[in-house]
UniProtKB/Swiss-Prot annotation, chain A:
The gene is brun. One of its GO terms (cellular component) is TRAPP complex. The modification Phosphothreonine is found at T329. Residues 314-327, 345-361, 945-954 have a biased composition (Polar residues). GO terms for biological process: actomyosin contractile ring contraction; Golgi vesicle transport; intra-Golgi vesicle-mediated transport; male meiosis cytokinesis; meiosis I cytokinesis; meiosis II cytokinesis; meiotic spindle organization; spermatocyte division. It comes from the Eukaryota. This is Protein brunelleschi. Cooperates with Rab11 and fwd/PI4K to mediate the flow of membrane through the Golgi, which is required to support cleavage furrow ingression, therefore promoting cytokinesis in male meiotic cells. Disulfide bonds: none annotated. Residues 362-400 have a biased composition (Low complexity). It is found in: Cytoplasm; Golgi apparatus. Disruption phenotype: Failure of both actomyosin ring constriction and furrow ingression in male meiotic cells.
Amino acid sequence: MRAAVGLMLSHGAGGMEPALSRPDYEQSALHHSCLLVLLRGVGPSRARVLQRAFEKVRRVNHIRVNDSSGHPRSIWIRFVHDHPVEHNDWGDFQTHRRLLGLVTIGKFDSQIELNELCRQHESLKVRYGSTLYESRAIFFGPDEQPLETIGEVLGPPAAGGRRLQDEFTTPSNFKAQAFFYREQDSCADLESRIGDFASALFWVLESRRLERSREKADKVSLLLAPFEKRDFVGLDMESRNNRKRCVGRVMKNLADLSLQAGLVDDALSLYHNANETLRSVGDSLWVGATEEGLCAASAMLLYPQMRETETLHRNSSLQEAGTSPLKNTPEKWRASDATKKISASDATANNVDSNQPQQRVTSNSSSCSSVSSLVTTATNSSASDTPTTSSSSTSTISAAPIPGHQRNGDLPGNILKAEEISNYYRKAIINYSKYRHAATIETEAALKASRICIEQNRPLDVAMFLQNILYINLSMSEAERVKRFEVITDLYQQIGYQRKAAFFQRLAALKHVQQGSQAPDWNQSYRLMLGSFTGYRLCLDPLEVIENAAGWPALQIDLVQTLITAARRLGHSALATRHMTFLLQTQWDNMSPTEQSEMAVQLQNLSAQCEGSPVPLVLENGTVIPPANLTDLPYCIDLQVKDLPAHLRPQRIKVAKADSGPFLFTPIHFNSVDRRDKKKDKNKIAFQWVQNDLSEVTVRLRNPLPFELPVTDMRLLTNGVVFESLPQTLVLQPHVPTYVALHGTPIETGQLDLQGYSTHTLGVKSNCRLKHMRGRSFPPNYVVDVIPALPRISVKTSLPQTATFSNMNSADIVVTSASLTLYNGESSSCTITITNESATLPLEHLEFSINSNVEQELQQKIFRIDEEAIKAHLPVPPQGTIEIIVDVFAEADFVCPQPPASLHSAAAPGDYGASSLTHYSSVSTSGHASLPSRVGSPHHRRNEPQNSSFRSTISGGPPSLAALTLHPGGGGGVGPSSLGSQYNQHIEAQVRFKYSGGDALTAGYCRQCAVSFNLELLPSVQITSWDVLPAEVASQFYLVLDISNLTAQEMSLNYTDTKNILIEAKESCRVPIPVDRCSLEKVVAARAAEVAENLERELCFRTQLLSFNDALSKLCSIHIAERVKIKWLLTGTDIQGIASLRGIVLSQSMVDLTAVSPLEWAISFQDTLVQPHNEIVCTVGQRSLLSIQLANQSLQPLRNLVLSIKFYQDYLNGMENYNLETRVAISGPNRIAIPLLEKQEQKEHTCSVIFFTPGRFKASIECTSNPQKQSEQPSSLLTRSCPAEAESVGQSVMFSSSYDEQQAHVWKFIPPIEVTVVEQ
Amino acid sequence: MAFCIAVIGKDNAPLYLTTSDMEQELELQYHVNAALDVVEEKCLIGKGAPESKELYLGLLYSTENHKIYGFVTNTRVKFIVVIDSSNVALRENEVRAIFRNLHLLYTDAICNPFYIPGESLTSKKFDRAVQKLMSGTA
């Protein structure tokens, strides 16, 4: 017996019998209990009506039938589309592999087509005839005529069917039952007919089962697997072991039939018995089959929900809507439910629970209700085949609980436990592995075991079974090998082993395109490779890959490269370019520089066929490939949003006014700081851009590749308002940072969102967004406000431009410059032409201001613009122009700031040959100053004779005329020894324009630009010294000026309306100018102003003495400046100007001469009124009366006046002799004190004069006010402080106090009286 | 003795991977990557009983040419060793010894105060020691 077994195995190893051609990968454990039916479409047509029929047929996968003894059976049907004939040969080994039924569906339009459909049906019957029980044909014919169709609707459907059958006839050799339907028929009865068909199959199966069960043990024949036939040739079949083998195999076959017939309990018992019998004789192959059968039967009872999985899977595959995330959720739910059921089953097995059976009964009752109608119909239809059943039997079926062993709610005792199933499968697989011909059976068993373990939520066992599949030695074709990998992939994905699934997906993909393959399927390879992305932490969105980078870069790079190869072989250039871009974007940091260069070159070559673009790529199967961008090619180091040029920068009109306020408080700064922080958080740009104006963003780029990188069509990426980007083309050198300016124009107003830039490099267009740039601290975007369009202007001037740059602030808004050279006092003008360059916007608002490096007041004198003339020209239409005239006057100080008193003090002592005017000045100064010195100086007493001789020298001729004649000749010697040379003065100024128009003006925006002015002031005329001398009449005085010509040319000087003088270059001359004296009204007004000022200053406790003098001095200065205008002209040129005397400083003595004297003189000599320049003659020894009348013309009383009369002789050589005691005698007092001279009061004094010697004498009559009584000042202050004083009294007191506080004043009778004494 | 030795971080990113045959490095990386599924599953099983958890995970899976063993530390760092299938003389005790030595080398390497956990192991000393361990002379 052992030798026989060895011989059998030896024959098996020979491999003479063909094995199953390929495994049935879709098979599951529960398919052991199904009746196998081939569902095939025949004919050329694949209309939608056939698809609907297919679905209706497939829906009938479960029926309930009553057997001959009245017990209900649960029958399942499995529909397949393809079934190799070789699988039928294994029907004895496992009966579920036997094809039992055949259903064909076809469509015909004519009799010939119908005959062809019948022929195809018959050929299929012949092919599977050895195992086929029953077959059906479903034919769809053409529709009836419209009239007949209407008639048919009224009639019964059966009649309609018959009519179609009457029209067409099947061939004579066609013996199957055919169902005819119209093309538009709803096929309402198709499902019931298929149910009848299934029932027919069941009854045939049942008869086979009963026949098998009735066989006697001693008469059974040996059942064989296809490859076992040769092994048993010549053996003694009657031996004990062979007899047991025959009985065991028959028992196993009967168990298979019982399982298919719905008798699970019987099947379990039979499997166990067969297992024991076959194991005793060492029949390993059939022992494995019994073990597999046990697992299948147990799975039927434990996991009936796996059938639902099958249904769900089919629907999912049909709809092609299944996705990995969606599949995972039901998976978890199903696993959880399975675990719960396993626990419940265990609990039920251990204890009988009364509640559990009720729940089961309820569930099964609902299931019975759902199929009750079908069962009823089936029963009615098959009445001829089964014993008669009554209606009460039908109602019993509806209410009956689970049949058989489950009536008590308990599982059979011999069922396998959940953990035992995997063990039994493992043992079965081990038994199968002993036979090479059973490799397909082994593979299918492993797959079934995997599916069971998936249901049991035991992934490690699944992994073990799947891994063992690879060890099975199968002579498979490449297509079958790929199919195996795909099935393994799917199962791995179900247990969540993404990496394993990806591994096998990659293997399947590589198998498709293996070397030596006759027809490489790159499409499948690509699809599988794409499906394996999840396992390697890849997805099609490059941004997700970058964010979730989790290592394994080498694998990712290799996978993407393989994908690129597949895409290229497919001929899909766009796809290859897209994936290569994806590779560079996601794996740039993980590649070496050499690899980076190689990939870049490859990308360049790929994109030469089809360019890459940043739009999603939709494949034919509906897959969407997201866009990939070369964000880091080139590498962006920095990106800065640039403000507009200064002269085009928008500013707020109102804000500017607010900013000009004089006070800035601290809280404003805090708010400003907070606002700044807030802006920083929002990535808000502080400045604004202007609609329709060119804007700029500066980008610093670096080329990380070792070769030149051309970048074309580089633009800004924006969001928000419409933005028109200008393309930029550049070539980046390797590893060198390059600055690029990207320009664009915002078309709308609002907020512009700058997100990055777009590039076109290496043949790929990329959107490089800031938020996707890693390793840099870029904000996600920049937000810029775009304000409405502002007009644009161009500015030109009539003066030449200058190349020098301005040192003033805000120099960046200067758009043009003008340079001008003027002599001090010269006038000129500049015409500024403003053109509105805007095409559509008028210039509606234009204001200007002038800034310079000199003081505001001086600036206003130098530059003048007529504002009204400008406003009259507004608005300026587009392309229009406006002219602005700026008048420029070279304002300067012509008066030398040297003190005149010191000048005269220095000049007077050594100058005895001066003119009479100079002499008068010396007399005035020395007369006042020499009063104290005369008393203490014996020098003057010794010089008395000289004065007398001097006075007699000038006794004849007009003194002023002589002086004027002498002056030009001695001008050079009279002036100061050295003149301070005046330097050139340089003035920088900016004429700033703020302009606006259109909507921007409404919004409160404007622009600002400036014209830079360079004004050079050359020195022209300078007054080095000045003095005030009394004139011939009392209403005038002489202003004596020393004028220097500081230019290099001859100057003609008009110092009065009628007088002219020429001054050579760098020369100076002395000029006397008669000027009217300042009127008393002005003096009164000045004093009134002084009083008002004093009232204010009382609160500040300031002294008023100096302020009054200052006021009066200013008054006289203004008086002189207003009346004296010195016009100068450079001889031979057109250059001319006016020299102003503004700023001239007058001393107190000068002020007394300038202002009109408050005293009015009336002097008579010998009863004759003395007139100016009258000849007065008297005789020696004769008494002459001298009468003097004083009148106070001022508004205030004069106090402490001293009237003095002195006679002296003037030698006209600078000497005056006052010691005339021996020549003149005065009877009566020559010094009279007047304590008080009220307003408009007159005083008269008369005395007699006797001359002892003949000669020429002069009389000096003067009135002096002395502030010697200063003790009254405190009382005056006290009086002023008294609150009880009335206003008028207070005013009067203040007048007095102010007068007392004044300095000493000397008023003289001008000119001095000249008396000629003659002999009788 | 070993084809490949890999150190995988807690986030399943490779910290160190070395092979004896450079031409097969990519293929071995694929195998190591696929083995992580089984490693994760075995780590998950031991969650319920931490006191009975063993660091050595045993044979993860085998192919025609390779056997892949796993080891996991208390800090969830995984060690993967790929051994030739034809080396039938290699016993399980020897594989355990390899992992024990590898664990010692790894702890020495991460004692470097300048090593940042989670980054690649670039220690030359560690690399040399692993090479010796791989060639069987350790």
